[in-house]
Amino acid sequence: MRKKTVQTSSTKSNAKSNTKSNAKSNTKSNTKSNARNSVKSSVKSSAKNSPQKAVKTVAPTVENVSVKQAVIVQKPSVEQNEQNIPTRQPDLGPRRSVAFIGSECYPFVKTGGLGDVMSALPKSLAKLNIDVKVIIPRYKCIPQKFQEKMEYRGSFDMNLCSDGKQYYVGIMEYQEDGVVYDFIDNDEFFSWGNPYTNLIDDIPKFCYFAKAALAALNYLNWTPDVVHCHDWQAALVPLYLRTCFQDTDVGRAISVLTIHNLKFQGIYDRKKIQYWSGLPDYVFNKDCMIQNWLDANMLKGGIAYSNKVTTVSNTYAWEIQTEEYGEGLAEHLRYHNNKILGIVNGIDTDIWNPATDKLLAADYDEKSAIKNKKINKKALQESLGLDVDEHKMVIGLISRLTNQKGLDLVNDVIPGIMDEHTQVVVLGTGDSQYENTFRYYENKYKGNFCAYIAYNENVAHNIYAGCDALLVPSRFEPCGLTQLIAMRYGAVPIVRETGGLKDTVQPYNMFENTGNGFTFDRYESGLLYDAINRAKTLYFENRKSWDDMVIRDMNKDVSWEKSAKQYKDMYVGLTPRD
């Protein structure tokens, strides 16, 4: 087994010696010539022999010294002395190493918000002096352009099942934006076209993945301070750390489990999970893995054994401890309340940036939004077959078409909100009942209703830029990204006050002209109808206040920067050092 070698260099002494020698030689040559020629030659010399070119790139923890050459004719001025003061890099704080383990990561594979988080959060943490490694399965569906750039790092056989059956583990590596991505390779488990198939196949697949990810870290001789696992697919990682791997190097790591959606828990037959995981019998008890007499719950076990449990918003961290939102785990979560923390997600503001978005008819920032959003509205109307009219209010809906997203409420209110001044655009796929209902509305309200029954990233960008408001009336919403993207693009969100929607959208206050959108609390179609009508009233009767809200939304910080700092503080708090 080859050990990974890390080289560290320091250029502090080099920069210092270069500065002294250059200053000395320049002073000596300048004083021998006349004043006029001295100034000319010294200026040329300083530009040509700038010591900045001699400074080597160093790791983020080492200070860089940048020195500007001073031109000395007789006595150096105060300004010249100030130029010789070394500049320091910003203090990025303590350094930690974190291994992210999850079932998907954009741009390699993505089916939902988990893929966005596994992509954007590690990149933001890398900028904060965190050494990050992301581990995901090497699915067959990963685009070939990424597969071709992966490098083989090694392979080994691993005991998996309770009977000690051996399975191949291959490691392929890809690096980008300061983050190392390691892909666990095994054709038996990951040759399907879709990351998720059914629990019969997914349970063995993710038992294997959780154990293989930790075994790969040991094989690579890369011991993280923190192992950060995500959702039920990686929830066995904390259990493996404290059982099968407790006497290995990686067993020293602290474990963090993030719940992106409590509805999905990895519940299946106890004997099946016990066999495939190979975990000891003592973890299969009612306080850990056992869901009922017959089933085991992988997420429940991860909650019990992890050092910290996070959710993707503050409100959701509280909601999941109630019977209404607890999905059968409310009592278990209340028992572990002391280690639950909510941190709101951000979005990748490089990808979602209307000022640089090449998919738009006209890019814009907060200064040009009011004008250029009209151009994008016209382009959206033309492309989707809607009546072209900049004076109409366009309301968008970008969502999976499922019960969770509040679509039964939307179906109830559509007939009431449709008029000659309003258009609705729906983008998404899901339950056939909702797909068919929206197709019916498209036929009924021709020219004013569009049902785009598919998910198309290009169309999504254009809806965010071209619509005036965006509906997110979810039954529950752990965090939600659509409302964050909507605000980034100046589309006013209309949301239900739940989970991350409540944390990120401040209700509009007509008396103070403040707020980011329109909200309603109880899950009732009448309240959604009222919220939409309040939005329409402001849009048509007080456009100045509406435009003010558009600008406020675009100026709102929805990036990962603040959230990444909270995660780093958590990592440092969990791994104190002298």
Spans of features found by a protein language model:
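Intrinsically disordered Ser/Thr phosphorylation hotspots
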Residues: S46, S50-K53, A59
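Catalytic cores of nucleotide-sugar-dependent glycosyltransferases that transfer UDP/GDP/TDP-activated
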Residues: R2-V6, K12, K53-K56, N64-D578
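Long, intrinsically disordered low-complexity tandem-repeat segments
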Residues: K12-A47
